[in-house]
């Protein structure tokens, strides 16, 4: 009986560990289930891709996960069309079109894609080296990876590590993941294959 119970417990532990190490999709390719729109900018699905596009108000817009995420690895692909000024926010909250949190930048060439910016706070916390910014394929599909664990954040672009930051304030942050469309109009960004693995 004891051996049977021990075997069952071991199976449960193995199953739990395996589940915690799995990537899951944040975007189903059909609609915006699991997400919430903030602002009047356009967020829609086209041919299995998530589209962010400037609206008539030309203001900031955000698409946030309804679920908060603390420690995780996030992978995604993005393609910048027109002015591709955007970003991925971590441990963030949004009220109206004002976001509180930290952004992993997505921008046109030589404007610090992969760097980390604190909105309505300290501003740029870290920028990538100029030579590393050459990893951006503007107008093409790019692969981004973001790891957030405790007070550490690391970003990669097309396999190239862009920045690594340790920050106590980020470590205390709480909130969800948000995609941004920048104010000013004329912006369009495509997203696909948004996947996340939660870390303990």
Where are these regions (language model features)?
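Sec-dependent N-terminal signal peptides
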Residues: 4-14
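Carbohydrate-interacting regions of secretory-pathway proteins
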Residues: 19-200
């Amino acid at each position: 009986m004891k051996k049977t119970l021990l075997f069952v417990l071991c199976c449960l532990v193995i199953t739990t560990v395996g589940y915690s190490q799995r990537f899951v999709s944040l975007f189903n390719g059909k609609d915006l289930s699991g997400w919430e729109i903030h602002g009047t900018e356009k967020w829609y699905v086209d041919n299995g891709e998530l589209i962010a596009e400037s609206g008539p108000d030309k203001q900031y817009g955000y698409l946030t996960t309804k679920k908060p995420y603390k420690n995780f690895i996030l992978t995604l692909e993005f393609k910048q069309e027109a002015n591709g000024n955007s970003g991925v926010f971590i441990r963030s909250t949004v009220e109206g079109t004002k976001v509180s949190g930290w952004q992993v930048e997505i921008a046109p060439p030589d404007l610090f894609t992969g760097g980390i910016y604190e909105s309505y706070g300290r501003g740029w916390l870290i920028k990538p080296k100029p030579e590393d910014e050459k990893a951006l394929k503007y107008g093409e599909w790019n692969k981004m990876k973001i790891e957030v664990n405790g007070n550490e954040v690391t970003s990669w672009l097309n396999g190239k590590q862009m920045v690594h930051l340790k920050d106590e304030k980020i470590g205390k942050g709480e909130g969800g993941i948000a995609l941004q469309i920048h104010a000013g109009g004329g912006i369009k960004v495509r997203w696909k294959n948004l996947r996340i693995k939660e870390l303990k």
